[in-house]
Amino acid sequence: MERQPKSLSDAVQLLQTTEIISKCTQTIIAEWSNEAETFKKRASSGRAGAELVLPSHELFNAQRTITAAIGKLIELVSEPSVRILEIAGQYQESRALYIAVERRIPDILASQDNEGGMPVKELSSRTGIEYRKLSRILRYLCSMGTFRQVGPDVFANNTISACLVANEPLRAYVRLTGSEAFTASDRLPKTLLDPSTGPSYDVTRTAWQDAIGTTKPRWEWIEERVEPDKLLDSGYHYPGIPSLILEPQPPGEDGLVARPELEIMGLAMVGGGRVFGAAHVFDFPWASLDNALVVDVGGGVGGFALQLSKVYPDLRFVIQDRGPVIQQALESVWPNENPAALKDQRVQFMEHSFFDKNPVEGADVYYLRYVLHDWSDDYCVNILSHIRESMAPHSRLLICEQVMNTTIGDPDLTSAPAPLPANYGFHARFSHSRDLTMMAAINGIERTPEEFKTILKSAGLALKQIWECRSQVSLLEAVRADARTA
């Protein structure tokens, strides 16, 4: 295949892109310096603030812009056929990370002097993976900048892998995406072409069901108790959680075990929420709401309410979800994370299906985080309609979701500077990856502003504002349509 010559337009874009990188680099270095001073002041005062968990607005904008520019740079300078092969093999990046996280390699490396690193043979004995194979996996991760090689077959954490040390919620997120979600994605090409599942948006007719070998919705399946040998051999495509090979779960008195995916899911929602959810704590004016009642609909174990409760001590919460999830929140999450809120009765827990009218009427805020992306449009209109029935004229609905931009831009969203893709391209990779994960697992959808407006209007609601936060996830504020026009 003959190479194609680059054009003058390519050269102009290359110069523009490198100029953007240069400007962003200066901003980032300046903001790093400001952060160092701020951290010193906070450490001496003992007070926590947004700057301890979030980059400044200037730093965030520079980070996403330079990441988008790096993607544009790769597009411009790569040999096209080489780039195609790179993309084709990128699934191995996530597999390598999943293997390392499953076997707790960041924690093992942190258990001794990180500067000196750990020989791969010692890592092998502690992980159960043959040392030469493990070395190849870690070399791959080091090449990606996820770990650090300090000598021949000697490895250590770097700043990226170190964020996984003693971080069970973030580890759970990697385990979630690397287990059942990955297996579902493997079946997606087949189910897209199937005349039954291809056009369907039913939550029981997805690539996930094809991979698992069940007709149940995912939420029912992960709540099952089964025979221990079923955890690693479902008889279908899904191999289960690998660590169970070396660390099997003991059965209960009934001879059954809980699926580990339920606990992983609960922790993963906390972990993912901490990564992208910190901005929602500080980039929305919660302080102005005083002692408002916030109903977290489908709130899981209450991961976001945990974050809010520690920063805004006057807010009150009702957390609603399925029974087993609420039980997990009451028994193992809140007693450890915020026992004071339980004692002071600032938080209540309620078993509730969001396909029924919300039993809490007239709350100040109804909060939907990562719920609507689980469902196709008809389901979403049903969910939203039942919330609207319970809303008072003063009530507001906050929807915490990815708001999808495209490479050509959207008038409701901020665009990246030219010649970068309007949606910040490389920076938005995770958003688009999660969109396809939703498609494969539950026929869910990550929506554009217009798609959100459509389902809100159908439910008798109106979009008031999109709060673009220091995150890939935004807040959409909606009110009753009749309240907006009153």
Swiss-Prot record:
Protein EC: 2.1.1.283
Annotated GO MF terms: O-methyltransferase activity; protein dimerization activity
Keyword vocabulary terms for this entry: Methyltransferase, S-adenosyl-L-methionine, Transferase
Reactions this protein catalyses: emodin + S-adenosyl-L-methionine = questin + S-adenosyl-L-homocysteine + H(+)
pH dependence: Optimum pH is 7.0-8.0.
Family listed: Belongs to the class I-like SAM-binding methyltransferase superfamily. Cation-independent O-methyltransferase family.
Purpose: O-methyltransferase; part of the gene cluster that mediates the biosynthesis of geodin, an intermediate in the biosynthesis of other natural products. The pathway begins with the synthesis of atrochrysone thioester by the polyketide synthase (PKS) gedC. The atrochrysone carboxyl ACP thioesterase gedB then breaks the thioester bond and releases the atrochrysone carboxylic acid from gedC. The atrochrysone carboxylic acid is then converted to atrochrysone which is further transformed into emodinanthrone.
Name of the protein: O-methyltransferase gedA
Organism: Aspergillus terreus (strain NIH 2624 / FGSC A1156)
